[in-house]
């Protein structure tokens, strides 16, 4: 081990001594310094050896290395923006108001023109729902008849309670479709029904009077026989006294007893008949009252039906009136009429068909854009956005700035882009500025929105393809 170290030490010492000696005579080893013209007169091989090399290649190589070093340093410390691109258009924050009918209708009047300014509540169109006028007329006629029936039964009920025909005042009821014939018909019906009730009640009264007379007749007979029985009782007592004195025969006493017993039997018969007649009198009174009660009950039932019918038809008329009111289409907001599709009087419009669009005047302009599914994970509310208008090249007219205001939570199906998310972008400025003038923007213009989702270094951007290739290639199958 020591021999190996000694040998190594000797070798290094030898090289050190050689280097020191060479260093001492280094200037003697250099070629003599000659001028440029002196080198030109040397032999060719010596001229090539003695002439110094040009500094240009060295300068170029140093410059390239310096540039690469600076580029690497800049790429490490410099950042670029990460952009998510979305296509969209300008829209009003309140959204344009679509005007649609609620049912199939005919156009009666058109009060506006394309591009006309309208105020809130101003009449735009007047429509007539198919069959609405006929339904309204039919309902009004039926309601008039129902109210007339209600009036008839109320008057008839009043007549029964007062037991006299009322004075009919048709002016108390509002019946625009009532004719003079209707009044005569109602009056005649009331008189006929009242007369029929009076006749029925009169028949029951006559029957009651008859039963009352029979009752009085039986009472008189009972009173007569009660007196006769008393007389026969006295006569029988006298005959019995005479018989005890043997003044008369026994047959005479027996005949008198038979008369007395017959009188008692007749009295019992009349009393039984009286009880029957009294029951018949009570029944006749009940029948008399029942005629009136049944008649009133029938009137009350008919009156209830008429009242229910009036209420039902009134509701139906209100519904028809609402249909006609809805047929008068008014402006929901103040704004400008656009996309007017109705131009023909008596033309047919269908349910939920867009007849026109009213663009509000006071709503602020904003951007609605569609964010692709691959970018939605990086887009957040409040991020800065650059908006480039398709109609005005941004290299000449510039661009707008804004911020992400809202992002929908659910994706929508787009025929070309697939599943996308709708977002609303709030603008910082509503016009494009040029040296000449301010260019106003309107709803419907197409735009391209560049949403700033973050920052990344340049070196990371340049190396990302390499990283991706390495990640894909260095995998075990």
Swiss-Prot record:
Residues 206-287 form a coiled coil. PROSITE patterns: HLYD_FAMILY (PS00543). The keyword Cell inner membrane applies. One of its GO terms (biological process) is protein secretion. It is found in: Cell inner membrane. This is Leukotoxin export protein LtxD. GO terms for cellular component: plasma membrane.
């Amino acid at each position: 081990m020591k021999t190996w170290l000694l040998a190594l030490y000797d070798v290094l010492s030898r090289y050190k001594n050689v280097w020191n000696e060479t260093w001492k005579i280094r200037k003697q080893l250099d070629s003599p310094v000659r001028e440029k013209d002196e080198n030109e007169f040397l032999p060719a091989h010596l001229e090539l050896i003695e002439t110094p090399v040009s500094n240009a290649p060295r300068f170029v190589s140093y410059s390239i290395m310096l540039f690469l070093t600076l580029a690497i340093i800049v790429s490490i410390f410099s950042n670029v923006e990460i952009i998510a691109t979305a296509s969209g258009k300008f829209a009003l924050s309140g959204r344009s108001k679509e005007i649609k009918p609620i049912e199939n209708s005919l156009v009666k009047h058109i009060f506006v023109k394309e591009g006309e300014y309208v105020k809130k509540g101003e009449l735009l169109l007047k429509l007539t729902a198919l069959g609405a006028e006929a339904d309204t007329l039919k309902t009004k006629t039926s309601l008039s008849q129902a109210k007339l029936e209600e009036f008839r039964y109320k008057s008839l009920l009043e007549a029964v309670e007062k037991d006299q025909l009322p004075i009919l005042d048709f002016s108390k009821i509002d019946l625009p479709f009532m004719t003079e014939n209707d009044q005569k018909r109602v009056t005649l019906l009331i008189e006929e029904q009242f007369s029929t009730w009076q006749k029925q009640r009169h028949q029951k009264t006559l029957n009651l009077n008859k039963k009352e007379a029979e009752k009085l007749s039986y009472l008189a007979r009972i009173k007569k026989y009660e007196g006769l029985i008393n007389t026969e009782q006295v006569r029988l007592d006298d005959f019995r006294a005479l018989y005890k004195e043997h003044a008369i025969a026994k047959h005479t006493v027996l005949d008198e007893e038979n008369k007395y017993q017959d009188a008692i039997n007749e009295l019992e018969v009349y009393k039984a008949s009286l009880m029957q007649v009294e029951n018949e009198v009570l029944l006749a009174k009940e029948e008399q009252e029942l005629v009136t009660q049944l008649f009133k009950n029938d009137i009350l039932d008919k009156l209830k039906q008429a009242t229910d019918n009036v209420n039902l038809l009134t509701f139906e008329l209100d519904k028809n009136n609402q249909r006609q009111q809805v047929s008068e289409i008014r402006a929901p907001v103040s704004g400008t009429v656009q996309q007017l599709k109705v131009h023909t009087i008596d033309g047919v419009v269908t349910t939920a068909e867009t007849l026109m669009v009213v663009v509000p005047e006071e709503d602020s302009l904003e951007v609605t854009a569609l964010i692709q599914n691959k970018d939605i994970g990086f887009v957040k509310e409040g991020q800065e956005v650059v908006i480039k208008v398709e109609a005005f090249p941004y290299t000449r007219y510039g661009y707008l700035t804004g911020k992400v205001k809202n992002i929908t939570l659910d994706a929508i199906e787009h025929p070309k882009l697939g599943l996308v998310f709708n977002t609303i972008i709030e603008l910082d400025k509503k016009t494009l500025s040029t040296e000449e003038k301010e260019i106003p923007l309107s709803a419907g213009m197409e735009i391209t929105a560049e949403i700033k989702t973050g920052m990344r270094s340049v070196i990371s951007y340049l190396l990302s393809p390499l990283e991706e290739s390495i990640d894909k290639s260095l995998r075990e199958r």
